Amino acid sequence: MTFPNINPVIFSIGPLAISWYSLSYVIGILLGWFYANKIIEKFKPQITKKNLEDFITYAVIGIIVGGRLGFVLLYNPSRYFSNPIDILKTYEGGMSFHGGALGGIIAAYLFCRKYKINFLSLTDIIAPVVPIGLFLGRIANFINGELYGRITNASFGMIFPNSDLMPRHPSQLYEAFFEGLVLFSILAYATFKHKTLKKCGLNSGIFFTFYGLFRITIEIFREPDIQIGFILDSLTMGQILSVPMLLLGSYLICQSNPK
C-alpha cells in the first residue's frame, strides 16, 4: 500500500506553522475537557467542574514538559545534550507518552496537594479522557509518517516516505485503534455501566493496565527507535517503560476491591 502523502503542516502564516501534531494536542485537550465535564455532571464526584477548569493549566504544562523531557532523556539524549537549543523545537515532533504521563501525574499531585483534593479521585476522572488524546496523537504520527512499524509481507504493509521504502506495519494506526478507540470504549463502559467512579483508583487502574498491555503487544509490530534499537536483544524502550504501568494498574485495581 502507498502511504497517503499528507502535508504535516496544515497552513503557515509567516514563520508560524500549524501542524497536525500540534492540532491533535489542542483538540485532544478540548474534547477531553468536554468529556470530563460530562462525567462530572452525571456522577457528581468529589471533583467539581471548577476543580477541572483550574487543573487544565497544570495538566497542559505537565504533559508538554514531561512529554518533551521524556523524549529527550529516554530516546535521544546525545543529540539534545550536544544541541540543547533543539529541546525547544517541539514543532519538529519528539514527545514521549510515558514522559507526558509522568508529567501529568506530577502535575495532578501538585494540584491536589494545593487544593486538598484526593489524588485518585482526580485521576479517575482523567483516565477515561486520556484515550481521546492518544487516538488523535497516533493519527498525527501516521500523517507525519513517523513511528512506523517493522517490515512485513502482509498485503496491508505500507511504504512510508521516511523509511527505507520497504512495506511496513502501519503501527501508528494499530495504536490509535487499541490505545485510543478500544481503551476509550473500555473505560466508558466501566464508568457509565459499572459505575467504577464509586471505587477510588479503579478507573486509573483500568487505564494503566490496559494501556500497558496494548503498548507492550503493539511494540512487537513497531520499529524500535533507530538511536536506541533493541534492549536486551529483543525488548523495546516502549515495552520496558510500559511494564511499570501494567504493574501499577494491577495494584490499583486490587486495592480498589479490598476483600
From Swiss-Prot:
Its main location: membrane. One of its GO terms (biological process) is lipoprotein biosynthetic process. It is found in: Cell inner membrane. GO terms for molecular function: phosphatidylglycerol-prolipoprotein diacylglyceryl transferase activity. Keywords: Cell inner membrane, Cell membrane, Membrane, Transferase, Transmembrane, Transmembrane helix. Its EC number is 2.5.1.145. Pathway: Protein modification; lipoprotein biosynthesis (diacylglyceryl transfer). PROSITE patterns: LGT. Pfam families: LGT. The chain crosses the membrane at residues 16-36, 55-75, 92-112, 117-137, 172-192, 201-221, 228-248. A 1,2-diacyl-sn-glycero-3-phospho-(1'-sn-glycerol) binds at R138. NCBIfam families: lgt. HAMAP family: Lgt (MF_01147). Belongs to the Lgt family. This is Phosphatidylglycerol--prolipoprotein diacylglyceryl transferase. It comes from Rickettsia rickettsii (strain Sheila Smith). The lineage of its organism: Bacteria, Pseudomonadati, Pseudomonadota, Alphaproteobacteria, Rickettsiales.
